[in-house]
Amino acid sequence: MAEFHFFCIDAHTCGNPVRVVTGGSIPFLQGNSMSEKRQHFLREFDWIRKGLMFEPRGHDMMSGSILYPPTDPANDAGVLFIETSGCLPMCGHGTIGTVTVAIEQNLIRPKTPGVLNLEVPAGLVRAEYQQEGKKVTSVKITNIKSYLAAEKLTVDCPDLGLLTVDVAYGGNFYAIVDPQPNFPGLEHYKAEQLIGWARVMRERMNEQYTFVHPENPTINGLSHILWTGKPIAETSTARNAVFYGDKAIDRSPCGTGTSARMAQWYAQGRLKPGETFVHESIIGSIFNGRIEAETELANQPAIVPSIEGWARIHGYNHLILDEEDPYVFGFQVI
């Protein structure tokens, strides 16, 4: 029976976990892009994600990344995102945490000091980081093109009734639930209620509607529900609680969710290029967002968003997936 060893550095980005896999039994992935490599990972190696993210080695909110060499030598690295919800096309909080870990631990030598160009399954992202001594104090990501995919869709939600939502893409597809007669705002509910409702809503929306990236059909399906509400701090623009996986609410403001919400606000005329979008999480942590440019995606209006936040390292792991362990591939209790 085989054992597979993985060397990981654990961090959190504004409260949400990031487990960066730095070495060990990292599989070779075929493909000319991180999108193609993601497909290979999903076909043959998703057991690694489950083993490292699910219990007993992980938990309901666990999220992480695996570092790879870039497919284009002009870039600094490739990143594959793994979490309880799947192998994601893009993860904003994960990128901030990965960059922090990579720079502080000397895992990547940047071609340009202060900048990392990262290949991710959703495309190419640029990360600019600030340092004080050996510490990375902030990371700003210029994300992939984001857009409002659908407006005023309806879905029946348990307990709440019929809800109207917009769906936007910021690296993943998000159903955005704004305050309305049947939902006055996230501040009126407990996290466990939002989680239970969101799980049913996501299933129903994927049954009722189809969501496919216009240029990359491997990016498809609604994966996240973004509940909105009144900010805690007067300096915040907006607040959200993002549901992912089967039992998780993002403790960070969610990078791809922030990108999706800025795309929604842009389409509604509520946010203009250059304006700051201070996005607050369920625990009050902050991402500073901004529209860097207006653009198009498959002839649809879109934006190039940026998100800035911080991360901290808090541990080192040598994790073992032992085939003699009945829970080698993890489990969830739902």
Curated annotation (Swiss-Prot):
Its EC number is 5.1.1.8. InterPro entries: Pro_racemase_fam. Substrate binds at residues 92-93, 224, 250, 255-256. Transmembrane segments: none annotated. It catalyses: trans-4-hydroxy-L-proline = cis-4-hydroxy-D-proline. GO terms for molecular function: 4-hydroxyproline epimerase activity. It comes from the Bacteria. The active site is at residues 91, 254. Keywords: Isomerase. Catalyzes the epimerization of trans-4-hydroxy-L-proline (t4LHyp) to cis-4-hydroxy-D-proline (c4DHyp). Is likely involved in a degradation pathway that converts t4LHyp to alpha-ketoglutarate. Displays no proline racemase activity. Belongs to the proline racemase family. This is 4-hydroxyproline 2-epimerase. It comes from Spirosoma linguale (strain ATCC 33905 / DSM 74 / LMG 10896 / Claus 1).
